[in-house]
């Protein structure tokens, strides 16, 4: 059973937070590698960089550059070791699916574009399971017929 995570799931793997225990245990129990796309990795890296900037401007927000850089190094190490299955989606098809999801669900539920693209990527890749800690994205994935176990 293939699974596709969003950035909230990846962040829970690489930074100790409320959902980390659940994310790590689920990831360890998976029979196959998580599928990741360049879009997901870009969003994850961007999020880390943004949190480092927030911290630099106001130490009560975000997290320190040393922590962020450690997260980026750990991700790179995991990618090099094959912890994740790097996928190369057909972005035209992902965009077609995303447009369909947007038309069907956004007006009623208010989904963000990146969330729609991640669910569309998972559908395109044939993933049966979507891993997220974002309630609105969970609603979209479930409405799209995916299992969201967390």
PLM regions and their residue ranges:
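Histidine- and aromatic-rich ligand-binding microenvironments
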Residues: 5-6, 36, 110-113, 134, ...
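Active-site neighborhoods of divalent-metal-dependent phosphate/nucleic-acid chemistry enzymes
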Residues: 82-131, 135, 139
């Amino acid at each position: 059973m293939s699974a596709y995570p969003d950035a909230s799931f990846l962040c829970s793997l690489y930074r100790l937070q409320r959902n980390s225990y659940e994310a790590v245990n689920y990831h360890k129990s998976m029979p196959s590698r998580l599928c990741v796309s360049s879009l997901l990795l870009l969003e994850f890296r961007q999020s880390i960089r943004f949190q480092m900037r927030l911290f630099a401007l106001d130490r009560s927000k975000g997290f320190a550059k040393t922590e962020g850089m450690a997260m980026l190094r750990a991700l790179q190490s995991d990618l090099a070791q094959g912890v994740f299955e790097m996928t190369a989606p057909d972005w035209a098809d992902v965009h077609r699916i995303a447009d369909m999801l947007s038309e069907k669900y956004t007006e009623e539920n208010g989904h963000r574009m990146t969330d729609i693209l991640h669910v569309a990527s998972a559908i395109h890749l044939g993933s049966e399971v979507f891993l997220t800690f974002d309630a609105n994205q969970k609603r979209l994935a479930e409405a799209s017929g995916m299992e969201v176990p967390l």
